[in-house]
Amino acid sequence: MAAATRRVFHLQPCENSPTMSQNGYFEDSSYYKCDTDDTFEAREEILGDEAFDTANSSIVSGESIRFFVNVNLEMQATNTENEATSGGCVLLHTSRKYLKLKNFKEEIRAHRDLDGFLAQASIVLNETATSLDNVLRTMLRRFARDPDNNEPNCNLDLLMAMLFTDAGAPMRGKVHLLSDTIQGVTATVTGVRYQQSWLCIICTMKALQKRHVCISRLVRPQNWGENSCEVRFVILVLAPPKMKSTKTAMEVARTFATMFSDIAFRQKLLETRTEEEFKEALVHQRQLLTMVSHGPVAPRTKERSTVSLPAHRHPEPPKCKDFVPFGKGIREDIARRFPLYPLDFTDGIIGKNKAVGKYITTTLFLYFACLLPTIAFGSLNDENTDGAIDVQKTIAGQSIGGLLYALFSGQPLVILLTTAPLALYIQVIRVICDDYDLDFNSFYAWTGLWNSFFLALYAFFNLSLVMSLFKRSTEEIIALFISITFVLDAVKGTVKIFWKYYYGHYLDDYHTKRTSSLVSLSGLGASLNASLHTALNASFLASPTELPSATHSGQATAVLSLLIMLGTLWLGYTLYQFKKSPYLHPCVREILSDCALPIAVLAFSLISSHGFREIEMSKFRYNPSESPFAMAQIQSLSLRAVSGAMGLGFLLSMLFFIEQNLVAALVNAPENRLVKGTAYHWDLLLLAIINTGLSLFGLPWIHAAYPHSPLHVRALALVEERVENGHIYDTIVNVKETRLTSLGASVLVGLSLLLLPVPLQWIPKPVLYGLFLYIALTSLDGNQLVQRVALLLKEQTAYPPTHYIRRVPQRKIHYFTGLQVLQLLLLCAFGMSSLPYMKMIFPLIMIAMIPIRYILLPRIIEAKYLDVMDAEHRP
């Protein structure tokens, strides 16, 4: 059986698409002309009892193109002889046309369509049907019962048949293929991505007297085939074929499809409860679309669409004149963020879209994610500084710095934390003070003051613009370096536990104690004879095999510590991924995922503290400070020592500058859909002010933490799922940009000072090490460097269809990966060196990656391939 089938794709470029990629498909992003397609009307007269088939869509590659899919199929029956010879094969003819989004500002018909249809549109909320047939039948019955829809000559069965096209042999059963649909699709350099949560179906019929619209919202996402795996909304547009060009079914469908193409708008519709709220959301969306002056709605557009949204990356490298206006960036940041400051406290608390539950779970997550590393690094600083900076001071500094940043920062989603590189720097300062007989508190304070001075200069001269030179590949190297430091800290801590308990040190202490007891007994009197003395020696100096209890205790401690660490990692990561599982209710899955870290920490802390009481576990050291807020005597240092501190402060400022801006850039990434703007320069100045106070009082420094800040954004995000090639992908709809979560977490961290030493000492060190592994593992998601390293271990047939694999020769990919690994090893060699003075210059190695990327790598790999591999990948 043969069939003449036509499938029409309407393409529409994104609003921010400069030019198309060099792949030969398109050369620019201007609008393309299209012809009106009216041939589908003739099918009404030839409908019969045909079967149906499915068709696969074509893949279109290009940069930042969004297009609609309009499927229109026509059937011509053939004889059974052709069917027998063809073996049931059908022919599918595919063509593409461009369909622009409706411009609500310029096209008056868009307003009239929406206002007219809202008065009589049929809205079906919470539809429980699972099949497409049942959903459409429910919508048609609702349409027929509506008194405003007077269509006496309309045959619902014929109308139902008009919605589908048969494309198969009758004896093989019916597989429905919709005749005419519109579906939102975005095509970028990384491939094609369908908006699978909505589907607009078009039908024309001569018996209809006027146009009608029916919208159905499904209770649960339904899988209706390829590229329609998560459908929540169905828009049905019915119209007679003979209409003015501005009133056709296609124009009406284009109006509603334009509105539903906004992911934030679809989320609002999911939150409505009544038909009136549903229609109010439609009117509100029309008003937002009207306020947009040029082109379609940007993906970030939300309720406050008039907010100026600075770009995540500057399209061109900064010029010298960009750094000249003193304090210009700070003034612009304050002007951008200050008008929205009250909303940072009221969003999610006041209004319709409340998110109190999400705020509570996110606050608990941040509390544990900040407190436990603070305890771990505080314990490390206590060992490295001989108690000058201990756990108590580290918790106090974390609470104070976090509170100030949560209250006054321009981007409160960024989380400040003391980190492993800072602990390395503090250790270097202690070594220098011991070598040159300097007062640690004074030298530490001067180093921090110089660091803050340089950070303030960077902020006033707008040096954050330099971060636009950091490519994705450079960011991935630094991010992976941070993850490696977490893993290394966990491994080193576990090795220390095994060295202390599993191997000979525990027994050495045991023998020492027994020997001292023997000496004391031998001095009791000379009346003991030689045989008794020999017996005592033999008893107390027994071999290790004769001390089963002692040996068992030490080995049990080491093995249990390893199991506790791995168990914390396993439980935390399993719960973190639990929201992707099919078990339990979606709300329960989301809560378990948000509270994964607290649950894992509390569970294994209780297991180690109460389940194995007889086994000694390694705990962090706590020595309460008599005066934790004593100010350093900065005047006691000589001018030469102050000058030396300036050099250390400059190198430290490089680390702060890179970490702060890099993490802030990851938080403000376009895929996170933040709407309140950025404040790179002001946040850098605020960071300098905060660390000035911490330096004077001998508290540990803090800066933006990775991956805590991106995880904070993720915890506050509403996501929409889509299914492609059997994999579930999440797209962020919006993020609750609030100060309450980081503010609450900082308050809880400060109150934790009251929990020292008990019950915080119930948290053993292996749980802290498990936390480090959890943070390192979760930070690897989406890291292309890790994915490309994994390609070396896979056979070529198992390579994923990513954009760089399709567009870059395989050898070039491996060359680029190898060069990245070499840079990572160089960074690790300096940052993790056993020589203290080598650790000081690893921030310069980070800066050196900029000329390596722009000067050295293009000499080895073509620039066009480098640009592809540095592009964002969205599956």
From Swiss-Prot:
Q: How is it modified after translation?
A: Glycosylated.
Please name the InterPro entries in this protein's record. HCO3_transpt-like_TM_dom, HCO3_transpt_euk, PTrfase/Anion_transptr
Q: Which residues lie on this side of the membrane: Extracellular?
A: 382-394, 431-443, 497-555, 613-640, 705-734, 784-787, 833-836
GO (cellular component) term, any one: apical plasma membrane
Topology of the protein relative to the lipid bilayer: Multi-pass membrane protein
Q: What is the effect of changing G726R?
A: In FECD4; interferes with post-translational processing; the mutant protein partially localizes to the cytoplasm
Q: Which residues are glycosylated?
A: N529, N537
Organism domain of life:
Eukaryota
Result for mutant: T418I: In FECD4; decreases cell surface expression; highly reduces functional activity
* PANTHER family named in the record: ANION EXCHANGE PROTEIN, SOLUTE CARRIER FAMILY 4 MEMBER 11
Question: What UniProt keywords apply to this chain's record, in alphabetical order?
Answer: Anion exchange, Cell membrane, Corneal dystrophy, Deafness, Disease variant, Glycoprotein, Ion transport, Membrane, Symport, Transmembrane, Transmembrane helix, Transport
Linked disorder reads: Corneal dystrophy and perceptive deafness: An ocular disease characterized by the association of corneal clouding with progressive perceptive hearing loss. Corneal endothelial dystrophy: A congenital corneal dystrophy characterized by thickening and opacification of the cornea, altered morphology of the endothelium, and secretion of an abnormal collagenous layer at the Descemet membrane.
Q: What is this protein called?
A: Solute carrier family 4 member 11
